[in-house]
Amino acid sequence: MTHPLDRPIWSALTTRQADIAERVGSAVRLKPDYGVFAAAADASERSRIALNYLDHGPEGLWLVEIDEVEPPPGLLVVHHTAPCVQMVADHVEAPKSAFTIERLGEADAADMFELARLTKPGPFFEHTNRMGNFIGIREKGRLVAMAGERLRPEGFTEVSGVCTHPDFRGYGCASDLMRITAARILARGETPFLHSYADNTGAIALYEKLGFRLRSQMTLTVLVREGAEGAPVIGHG
């Protein structure tokens, strides 16, 4: 039986997060205002062809699997691939943070979107903040750091959207927010996990220090319509 984290997008969007997904036959994707992630039911040509009929948007479809996804016959071609790592944590202690940590909600959505666009922590769209719980740090009313939850397969929750304004890096904001987020996931009886680009060695070292360990090598495949102009924005892992 396939482990849920071997196919995190399919596992999440066909179970706990099916309400924010769009499905066409054997293919599924996040609704475009939530994100760009998509998956086919399996690696068969029949399942992959269904990817052609999803809404591709200007950013294309982002698939995260153990192996690179072969483009289906038809409209889609590979625009970009990147090796990634998937990490999980079995124990994380929430820090006694020197910062005032706030829970972020709909009233903070515009500030969250602005910070994500500035820092590029990965794909972040109008309603990405609704995918799970987010927390943040404000300085004189300005949101300067945040972290939250994204994909939620059964028994697991992804830590994502971690970013800090350039003027406030080096103070430990991101590590505190990540530890708090991961500890709260564990307290719910779930396992926190995350993804990073494999060449982002600095980030991976930080994640290991926080209590995460390597679970699997993964591959990001970005599929776009043949002949599409421009490139999707690839954020930091």
Give each language-model segment a name:
Residues 2-96:
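Acyl-donor-binding surface of acyltransferase catalytic domains
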Residues 69-76, 175, 198-216:
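Conserved active-site alpha-helix within GNAT-family acetyltransferase domains
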Residues 37-41, 162-169, 197:
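A short, internal acetyl-CoA/4′-phosphopantetheine-binding micro-motif in the GNAT/acyltransferase core
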Residues 64-69, 193-204, 220-231:
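Conserved beta-strand-loop-alpha-helix junction that forms the acyl-donor binding cleft
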